[in-house]
């Protein structure tokens, strides 16, 4: 597995980001359109910016493994949710222009503060069904533009476990839906001490459906899970990488939840400790 990184890890414009990636010998990037001055899910196509991005990708030999499309799929603000659903078609068309096959999603939360913050209403049947309805809308675009939609079981979202992600896959039975495996996102204050069991069960359920794997870590601070750079936490990386290999994952390992000044140390840690990474 080669290492990759989120474009928003870096400060600067796209050319500056790709220069930094070259200096760190990183060739793969999960990209956010905000890095070229566009909305993540824009309401129009800026062909000049996209054409310039394609030129830079070729110049610096950077490959985009995915685009971010993470709006709140069960947003309490119905008008905002509907706008994002409509504009998602534009993002799919942009993905085609950039030769990107995968768009990442956030399954969402009923929290009024953040789509990444837990709300007890996430556990209701109504929230789950609302997510399914949003997913159904996005799948129409995915089919039209031949895009894979990647969902991520995340402890603060409506799809907050590998079992629920499995249920989504079984509900739709659609090759345009795949999984982002971020082991740290499976953990919460109730299960992190039993992380090996949680991670093994997750791979048993969804290990054959992984399209993208994320590399971040976690610590406990103020009785909460805090996400940190790959080199700095409690995650059993040895187990995660062993399971990615067991399930024949062929994609990249995308560094996540780190500051720009932590990238070099994260690369060093991952490459020196795990032979599967290069």
Stretches with model-predicted labels:
Residues 1-12:
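Boundary/entry segment of secreted carbohydrate-active catalytic domains
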Residues 2, 29, 67, 133-234:
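Acidic/histidine-rich catalytic cores of soluble enzymes
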Residues 9-11, 33-35, 71-73, 107-111, ...:
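Active-site-proximal loop/turn and secondary-structure-junction residues that shape catalytic pockets
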Residues 16-19, 58-59, 76-179:
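Active-site acidic/histidine proton-transfer and metal-coordination neighborhood
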Residues 18-25, 45-65, 89-99, 139-144, ...:
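Acidic (Asp/Glu)-rich catalytic clusters
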Residues 30-54, 107-113:
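Glycine-rich, proline-tolerant flexible connector loops at the mouths of alpha/beta enzymes
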Residues 44-51, 81-89, 121-125, 132, ...:
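Charged helix-capping and loop-helix junction motifs
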Residues 263-278:
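C-terminal helical cap(s) of enzyme catalytic domains, especially alpha/beta-barrels
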């Amino acid at each position: 597995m080669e290492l990759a990184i989120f474009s928003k890890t870096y400060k600067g414009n796209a050319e500056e980001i790709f220069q930094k990636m070259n200096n760190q010998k990183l060739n793969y990037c999960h990209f956010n359109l905000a890095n070229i001055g566009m909305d993540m899910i824009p309401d129009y196509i800026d062909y000049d910016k996209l054409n310039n991005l394609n030129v830079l990708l070729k110049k610096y030999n950077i490959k985009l493994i995915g685009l971010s499309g993470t709006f709140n799929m069960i947003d309490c603000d119905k008008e905002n949710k509907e706008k994002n659903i409509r504009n998602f078609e534009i993002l799919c068309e942009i993905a085609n222009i950039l030769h990107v096959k995968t768009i990442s999603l956030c399954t969402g939360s009923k929290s009024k503060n953040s789509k990444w913050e837990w709300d007890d209403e996430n556990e209701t049947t109504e929230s789950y069904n609302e997510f399914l309805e949003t997913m159904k809308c996005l799948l129409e675009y995915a089919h039209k533009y031949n895009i894979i939609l990647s969902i991520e079981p995340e402890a603060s979202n409506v799809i907050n476990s590998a079992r629920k992600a499995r249920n989504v896959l079984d509900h739709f039975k659609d090759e345009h839906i795949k999984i982002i495996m971020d082991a740290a996102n499976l953990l919460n204050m109730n299960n992190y001490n039993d992380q090996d069991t949680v991670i093994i069960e997750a791979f048993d359920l969804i290990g054959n459906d992984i399209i993208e794997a994320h590399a971040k870590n976690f610590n406990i601070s103020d009785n909460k899970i805090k996400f940190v750079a790959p080199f700095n936490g409690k995650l059993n990386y040895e187990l995660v990488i062993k399971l990615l290999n067991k399930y024949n994952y062929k994609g990249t390992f995308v560094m996540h939840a780190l500051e720009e000044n932590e990238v070099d140390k994260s690369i060093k840690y991952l490459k020196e400790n795990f032979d599967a990474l290069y």
